[in-house]
UniProtKB/Swiss-Prot annotation:
Entries under NCBIfam families matching the protein: leuC, PRK05478.1, PRK12466.1
Keyword check for Protein biosynthesis: no
Gene (UniProt): leuC
Annotated binding of [4Fe-4S] cluster, by residue: C347, C407, C410
Gene3D superfamilies per the UniProt record, alphabetical: Aconitase, domain 3
Organism this protein belongs to: Klebsiella pneumoniae (strain 342)
Biological processes per GO annotation: L-leucine biosynthetic process
E.C. no: 4.2.1.33
Superkingdom per UniProt: Bacteria
Keyword Amino-acid biosynthesis: yes
Protein role: Catalyzes the isomerization between 2-isopropylmalate and 3-isopropylmalate, via the formation of 2-isopropylmaleate.
Biological or metabolic pathway of the protein: Amino-acid biosynthesis; L-leucine biosynthesis; L-leucine from 3-methyl-2-oxobutanoate: step 2/4
Record's protein name: 3-isopropylmalate dehydratase large subunit
EC class name: lyase
Length: 466
């Protein structure tokens, strides 16, 4: 029987499935950070349990960390406690921790792939909703809650029901300058922010195959923003070349044997999906969100939509509420909207290719008066590579702030946040009310588009920048 990639991954990890019961899955990798793990470790301690597979569990600090100093006290009392608890718990339970002083420290979904912790064919979980990022490797990766974190720590297994399947086919080639971020925002614009609910999404088509691994990670990172459980891209030579030689990747003959298996991880001819969505890559322009969910998105050349143009009454009401919160008037060109802050970073867009794209726009230009622009590399290795390439100097010379790795302004859990009413062009993944700070107004864009907003002071079409 022909199977989808998701069905192959799921079935390969079923440990036990009783009749009319939820299947029990084996978990290959468990990624841990400081926010969703303290209660889970406390639960182990309370019941006298150990971490079942400490060698398959990897921890880092990212959500709460300061991006201006490596001082654990810099982000406030709650953050300090969470980070100290992680240090204590990892030491007690034998889990490898990339703490603030470790060269590999960074955002969990950047650190995993770059260290070869993430490999094709795996099941990967983390107490974080953007765990879908790792699906770019052809791994079944999804976020879990703190009680599930405890269960995986204790058993290396998790009960999971089967999801429905969705194929998103992005046909043809994308135009020059169109990035994975533009593609995924255009997809969510078409499906809506709940269009993938109950599904695992597989991204297919020529435009997807053309993406680098970093682009594919951006794509899968935002699968959750269309309501999907996880996102997948089938592994290919691009995947194998990225993984080869990384710290935790197989070596020598083991790697060759792994690749032989990984090549079987693709949807069979004749396999059927519950839902199929098709887009033409050539029609995708640079994207900018205008509202308070990622599905409220338009091309940079468009005008802010009129709520009356939405036939669905729920969408119309949502648009009215979003425009009021965002302080926008329908009908005005998006390029007339001025910004106060720019954030280039997050688990969506803080890898080396993202920073190169932003630096290309920033080079020889200056951040517009009155705009604060932050560039936050996703990890220690990304920061080191960017500095070796001189990208930090380009940003600093242009007036951007060059920061230490961390989740930063993606979410208001550290010192990097918006003040009420401030408008931000952000490369992150969520534009919900208050996501970047109470009363903050978030517009999601690609790294190049964020840099363009920084130097012009408003949203600008990168295709027209001279």
């Amino acid at each position: 029987m022909a199977k989808t990639l998701y069905e192959k991954l799921f079935d390969a990890h079923v440990v036990y499935e009783a009749q009319n019961e939820t299947p029990l899955l084996y978990i290959d990798r468990h990624l841990v950070h400081e926010v969703t793990s303290p209660q889970a470790f406390d639960g182990l301690r309370a019941h006298g349990r150990q971490v079942r597979q400490p060698g398959k569990t990897f921890a880092t600090m990212d959500h709460n960390v300061s991006t201006q100093t490596k001082d654990i006290n810099a982000s406030g009392e709650m953050a300090r406690i969470q980070m100290q608890e992680l240090i204590k718990n990892c030491k007690e339970f034998g889990v490898e921790l990339y703490d603030l002083n470790h060269p590999y420290q960074g955002i969990v979904h950047v650190m995993g792939p770059e260290q070869g912790v993430t490999l094709p064919g795996m099941t990967i979980v983390c107490g974080d909703s953007h765990t879908a990022t790792h699906g770019a490797f052809g791994a079944l990766a999804f976020g879990i809650g703190t009680s599930e974190v405890e269960h995986v720590l204790a058993t290396q297994t998790l009960k999971q029901g089967r999801a429905k399947t969705m194929k998103i086919d992005v046909q043809g080639k994308a135009a020059p300058g169109i990035t994975a971020k533009d593609i995924v925002l255009a997809i969510i614009g078409k499906t809506g922010s709940a269009g993938g609910t109950g599904h695992v999404v597989e991204f297919c088509g020529e435009a997807i195959r053309d993406l680098s691994m970093e682009g594919r990670m951006t794509l899968c990172n935002m699968a959750i923003e269309m309501g999907a459980k996880a996102g997948l891209v089938a592994p290919d030579e691009t995947t194998f070349n990225y993984v080869r030689g990384r710290l935790h990747a197989p070596k020598g003959k083991d790697f060759d044997d792994a690749v032989a298996y990984w090549k079987t991880l693709k949807t069979d001819d004749g396999a059927t999906f519950d839902t199929v969505v098709t887009l033409q890559a050539a029609e995708i322009a640079p994207q900018v969100t205008w509202g308070t969910n990622p599905g409220q998105v338009i091309s940079v050349t468009d005008n802010i939509p009129d709520p009356a143009s939405f036939s669905d009454p729920v969408e119309r009401a949502s648009a009215e509420k979003a425009l009021a919160y965002m302080g926008l008037k329908s009908g005005i060109p998006l390029t007339d909207v001025a910004i106060d802050k720019v954030f280039i970073g997050s688990c969506t867009n803080s890898r080396i290719e993202d920073l190169r794209a932003a630096a290309e726009i920033a080079k020889g230009r200056k951040v517009a008066p009155g705009v604060q622009a932050l560039v936050v590399p996703g990890s220690g290795p990304v920061k080191a590579q960017a500095e070796a390439e001189g990208l930090d100097k380009i940003f600093i010379e242009a007036g951007f702030e060059w920061r230490l790795p961390g989740c930063s302004m993606c979410l208001a859990m550290n010192n990097d946040r918006l003040n009420p009413g401030e408008r931000c062009a952000s490369t992150s993944n969520r534009n919900f009310e208050g996501r970047q700070g109470r009363g903050g107004r978030t517009h999601l864009v690609s790294p190049a588009m964020a840099a363009a907003a920084a130097v012009t002071g408003h949203f600008a079409d990168i295709r027209n920048l001279k």
